[in-house]
Amino acid sequence: SFVRDDGPLEPHSYYRLGSGSTINASIVGFDPSPKEHEDRITAAISTIQRSVLEKIVLARSVDIQFNPPVDPLAIAARLIDQSHNKDGFVVDLSPAGGRYQGRTLVGSSPEVLIKREGSTVSAYPLAGSAGRVEDRDVDCFIGQQLRTNAKDLDEHTFVVNHLVNVLEPLCSSLEVPNHPELTRTNEMWHLATPITGTLRDKNMSALELALNLHPTPAVCGTPLHAAEDLISSVETDRGFYSGAVGWCTSDGNGEYMVAIRCAEIAAGGASARAWAGGGIVASSSADKELAETTAKLRTIMRALGLQ
C-alpha cells in the first residue's frame, strides 16, 4: 500500500504514548571506523589534487541493535516529530528482493531531488553544510560563515551546475538564483538553491526526471564516473542510502527526495544501519569532514534516543 500526505505529517498517538513509543537502542559498530573514514578522506583529497576528480562524496555507517525489536513506524514517528519540516518516509524494501526482503528504509530528508506539478518542475539541492550548536549566537555565526565559505560554495556549485545541465535542455525556462540561500534542519545548516522550470515535454514524468538527475554530485561526485569508481573501491554497499525516494502518479506528477538522513531496518526490527556522508573537494579538511558526518547522523540518532 502507498500513503502520501502533503504534510505536516502527524504520527499516530500509539507511537507517541503507547508501547510503540518505546525504543531501546545501542550502537554496536561502525563501517568504517571514524579513524578509517578520516584516512579515506585524506586519501580522497590527495586524489582530487592530482587527478580529474573534482568532488567526491564519501559516506560512513553506524550499526545499531534494538532490544526488544523495533517497529519501523516508531522510528518514523520520532523522525517526523523531530523534523524541522514535520516530514518523513517509510519504505518497504521487500520488492527489491534478495537480502532486502522484509527490510524497511526510514528517514526524513531535507533535500528535494525533483518535484513535478503539471508542467512546473522544481528542485532544492543541498551541498555545503555545517553542524548546529545550542548557543544561539554561536549557531547564527556558524550559519553566516557557511554562506561565505569558499570550500562550501565550490561544493554547492558542482551540484547546481549538474542540475542545470540536465534540466536546461528539458525546460523552456529555468530560474536559478545566482547565489545559494541558507537553510536549516534541527541539526544542520545547509547551502541550498531553489530551482524552478517549465517543462518542454509535458509528458515527462517526475520519475523520468529523477532518473535523469540521479546521482547528483551531492551524493556521488564529479566527474560522475571517476567518483563512482572511487566510491565503489573504498566503500561497502550503501544499500538504498543516497538513492531517491518518492512517488509518481499516473499523470506524471510527483516528488522525489534524496534518500539521506535515513536508516535501513532489518527484517524483524532487531537491527539497523544508518548512514551519513560529506562532499570532499581539494580544499577539504579531513577532521572537519568527519565532524560533518557525525552532525548529520544526529537526525537518526536522536530519533533512536541515542543522543
Question: What label would you give each PLM region?
Answer:
Residues E54-K55, L174:
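Residue-level detector of short coil/turn "hinge" positions at structural boundaries
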Residues P34, P69, S284-D287:
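Ordered, soluble secondary-structure elements with a strong preference for glycine-centered loop motifs
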Residues R60-D154, F158, P169-E175, G252-G277:
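An anion-binding catalytic pocket shared by soluble metabolic enzymes
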Residues I56, G88-D92, G239-G246:
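A short glycine-rich, hydrophobically flanked beta-strand micro-motif that places a catalytic Asp/Glu
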Residues P194-Q307:
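Conserved hydrophobic core element of enzyme catalytic domains
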Residues F2-K35, D39-T42, S46, R60-N67, ...:
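Contiguous alpha-helical scaffold segments within structured protein domains
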